[in-house]
């Protein structure tokens, strides 16, 4: 487990290159290793936030199915929090470090150079899918 907070920006100005998928898969892998992970969804389309909601809906569906079948419910969850954010928050990396511990994965939007630049400046590590 980390003793500090590491900010990781998954960024590219181009859309459709897999930023959200990359961010969520990295977060999932780290969470499965027992790391504390938070995804900050700075993408105005809310892809990571929607992903989180889809998992919640699927968990509810499975719970109802398990109840109907009389079987124990095994929770279906991401294993980390997804928080909607914006460039103002990203511009305060010290506040992010105070609030969130472990790994903070930042999912950035396409076609918003300002938010992408702010995320890259805040990050300790940048991943640019292509």
What are these model-predicted stretches?
Residues 2, 7-17, 24, 29-105, ...:
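P-loop/Walker-type NTP enzyme "switch/lid" segment
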């Amino acid at each position: 487990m980390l003793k500090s907070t590491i900010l990781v920006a998954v960024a590219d100005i181009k859309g459709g290159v897999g930023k959200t998928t990359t961010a969520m898969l990295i977060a999932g892998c780290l969470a499965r290793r027992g790391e504390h992970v938070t995804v900050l969804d700075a993408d105005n389309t809310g892809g990571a936030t929607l992903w989180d909601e889809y998992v919640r809906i699927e968990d509810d569906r499975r719970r109802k199915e398990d109840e109907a079948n009389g079987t124990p419910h095994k929770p279906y969850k991401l294993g980390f929090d997804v928080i909607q954010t914006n460039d103002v928050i990203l511009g305060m990396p010290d506040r992010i470090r105070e609030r969130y511990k472990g790994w903070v994965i930042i999912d950035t939007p396409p076609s918003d150079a300002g938010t992408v630049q702010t995320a890259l400046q805040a990050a300790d590590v940048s991943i640019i899918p292509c």
